[in-house]
Amino acid sequence: MRKVLLLFILLSNFLFSQGPSNIATANRDLWKLPMKSTKDFDVASKLEMLVFLETFKDIDVLNESELFKTLGVKDGSSSGVKTWKKQTQDRLVSNFKDLEADALSEVISVKANPTFPELVLATKKLSNELPENLKNWYQNSKSFYKTYILECLRLAAKSNKRTSEINTLDPTEKNGFESKDKSYLLTFDDGPTQKNGHTDKLINILKEQHLNGIFFLSGDKLQQRIAANGKNNVASMYGENWIGSHSMVHKSHQYLPDWKLQIDESNSIIKDVFDFNNKTFYFRPPYGQRSPEIINYLLKNKQPILLWNIDSQDWSEKISSQEVSSRVITLMLLWRKGIILFHDVHPKAAVAVPAINEYFKDCQIKWLKPDEIQ
């Protein structure tokens, strides 16, 4: 067993030497059970959580030194890793309590309201009790979660030097885990693009799908769009979607000397275009990186931070539109609630969002409107 772990470490060192460019991708075509009801959703969710947990426990046997070496992180945050692990365990236990009773016995039997140790025991059934038509999905899922868990642990391990969405810094921050079961919010960063670009196409697709979300605008790109098309045209193009700020420039604000200027300038441009009467004006820090000083400054201006817990990774050239939708679907089943991060400056969200909506159309998930954020 020890030799297997050491091989895993060496392989992971190679894979993670390039950091976040290694992205967990799933293949939903390998899931051979129906997705036509709330029960079907819960059966799939249960199995995703069990495979995640099985992989989580495999990685958890690494000691701190081995883990940080695997992640390629020096002087990592022990507390950040411990916090993420504890929160993850608690979230999984809570998620199992939300499963329909008749889904508990399907495929892999799990007792009602299981404890974390009982869930660990249930994962031992996966290799022997899964039907033949789910074996390929199982192998793909294990590979997905191995990479995904390391994605999360890497963020947690680096949280002492670089903050991110992996942990909240203040009770007022929202990341999606505070939402109700099977409730999801769509969010889109970095726009707007120029006229008839990806932003415009995505807005039209959202309207066709009867969906909306929050667009976090970059002040510099908004200025360019206003200069090209006029303030009134920009103000009307987003329809029922809400607007948030992504600051003036897309740079990490955690150590940026003029972060206050960047925030204020972007806010001024956005508020000159959009009406925020009875609407919360959210802020999303670039890369999710912020400091307590930034949080306090924003709160004084009644501008809470909105993070995310489901990252589509749609910005990467290494992941296709189909892989984006499969990744998001898988994480929606795993976490059972959340804020989903897309980017409207790239084309993949316009393909992935309709595919995700179609996949879950019979499962009674709730697409949150911005004013329904918990």
PLM feature segments, named:
Residues 2-185, 197, 204-213, 336-374:
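Terminal accessory/targeting
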Residues 19-45, 297-318, 322-335:
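Active-site-adjacent pocket scaffolds in enzyme catalytic domains
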Residues 48, 144, 232-233, 323, ...:
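Exposed alpha-helical structural elements
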Residues 51, 83, 90, 94, ...:
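Charged/polar, solvent-exposed surface patches and flexible loops
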Residues 114-125, 132-136, 182-184, 194-196, ...:
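Metal-dependent polysaccharide deacetylase catalytic core of the NodB/CE4 family, i.e.
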Residues 160-177, 255-271, 325-327:
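Short, composition-biased local secondary-structure segments
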Residues 199, 259, 263, 324, ...:
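Aromatic/hydrophobic pocket-lining residues that form the small-molecule binding cavity
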